[in-house]
Amino acid sequence: MTAHFPFDNSYVALPPNFFARVAPTPVAAPRLIKLNRPLAVQLGLDPDLLETPEGAEILSGNQMPETAASIAMAYAGHQFGNFVPQLGDGRAILLGEVVDRNGVRRDIQLKGAGRTPFSRMGDGRAALGPVLREYIVSEAMAALGIPTTRSLAAVLTGETVLRDPIQPGAVLTRVASSHIRVGTFQYFAARGDLASVRALADHAIARHYPEAAQAPSPYLALLEGVIGRQAELVASWMMVGFIHGVMNTDNCSVAGETIDYGPCAFMDTFDPKTVYSSIDQFGRYAYGNQPPIALWNLTRLAECLVRLLADDDDKGIEIAQTALGGFAEQFNAAYLAKLAAKLGLFTSQPDDQQLSQEFLTALAKGEADFTLAFRRLSDAAVDPSDLGEVRALFADPAAFDEWAPRWRARIATEPQDATTRQAAMRRVNPAYIPRNHRIEAVIRAAVDRDDFAPFEEILTVLANPFEEKAEFARYAEPPQPHEQVLETFCGT
């Protein structure tokens, strides 16, 4: 029986300069590592069929579903501030789109499926390590409630890829609301192709912002919609210590999802200057720089839309600048509301922002673990007089000791009872995140020993990040000094 993919493809209806038609390059011996069965069901796919050898053939790119329209998408992008007029899918091939059980259109893409016209000097392949990292982190982000691309499957290819060191090859099946990036708009704008910019904007409105079509200025509504989603997204990143690592405009999703996990990492000890990515030598994409970089990326999008916002360039620029001016307010509102909730502040008082920021200052001064400090504060919410477990996380607790009495006094003014407050705090302060040293251990077991049991276990743990279980206690702990991962790599 043939695995059925109910593709309903819309992107291929756009002009041919938007993509290149390309077939995946076959692999030697595909072997399914993991299928995301709940996601498969949500997409209207048959997980039992996908777990057969035929399913592995499809998920590796060896066989194409009948209704697939496999393409590599064209886009440009600013990489670390430098504009590259042509990038495109160099190792990813979009099989097609399905409408899921919630009526949402989703892309299904094979990452590591072989060379495309956009591959430049690359081999079009993916190594096992980065595939496992993206699978783990994207699914963890989904469980944390943060908009993200998803991972449907991971498949070994039976081949090796030339990396340093040589690694087993793998293919990731990625699912996204779309793969339209800021860089997609830049690709056409850089060529002076206003007709294609307009066609892309119309497509993005129809797919992601249908309400914008009824607005007095649909293209302004599109820009404002993307600004709002990015503000909310990056605020959510900040709440879990997530560092994307490579916030280039080609990695900025117009749909407002986290995309392209590459050298991403989660911060252990709180420090706004934290950088893990080996290619971010000057800290452009450090944890604390992510909000202004998001605005920088959105400004590049606005530049592409100026001629759609008004016939006169000066007027279009003025309209765009006004829209961009709303980012800071939207980000700050989302950020401060989320941060207050993490501290158990569910009503608003004038000094809440200062109290919240002072806790972050105490974390930095005390070199405390970001995730664990908030979680232990949640645990202490029932009896705020005993903050011993929180205090023990601080190498230097002086700033925390100064802050703690003010927090106790503030939460005493909250209307809910202590048990309700604790439950609410635990719903926003995860016990488990994909800690870098845990991911590295999973990758080493898989790459070095062909052992995927640790991979399965970490997925189980991270599927319920807010539910603490004694048997998973080690996953909540920060790394020991010898376990610390100080640098992450893109893997391309």
Swiss-Prot record:
Known catalytic reactions: L-seryl-[protein] + ATP = 3-O-(5'-adenylyl)-L-seryl-[protein] + diphosphate; L-threonyl-[protein] + ATP = 3-O-(5'-adenylyl)-L-threonyl-[protein] + diphosphate; L-tyrosyl-[protein] + ATP = O-(5'-adenylyl)-L-tyrosyl-[protein] + diphosphate; L-histidyl-[protein] + UTP = N(tele)-(5'-uridylyl)-L-histidyl-[protein] + diphosphate
Active site: 250
Keywords: ATP-binding, Magnesium, Manganese, Metal-binding, Nucleotide-binding, Nucleotidyltransferase, Transferase
InterPro entries reported in the protein's UniProt record: SelO
UniProt-listed Pfam families: SelO (PF02696)
Sequence positions that bind Mg(2+): 251, 260
Record's keyword annotation contains Nucleotidyltransferase: yes
Keyword Nucleotidyltransferase: yes
Cofactor list: Mg(2+); Mn(2+)
MF annotations from Gene Ontology: AMPylase activity; ATP binding; magnesium ion binding
EC primary class: transferase
EC number: 2.7.7.-, 2.7.7.108
Binding site for ATP: 88, 90-91, 111, 123-124, 174, 181, 260
NCBIfam families: PRK00029.1
Similarity comment: family membership: Belongs to the SELO family.
Record's function text: Nucleotidyltransferase involved in the post-translational modification of proteins. It can catalyze the addition of adenosine monophosphate (AMP) or uridine monophosphate (UMP) to a protein, resulting in modifications known as AMPylation and UMPylation.
Protein name, UniProt field: Protein nucleotidyltransferase YdiU
Originating species: Rhodopseudomonas palustris (strain ATCC BAA-98 / CGA009)
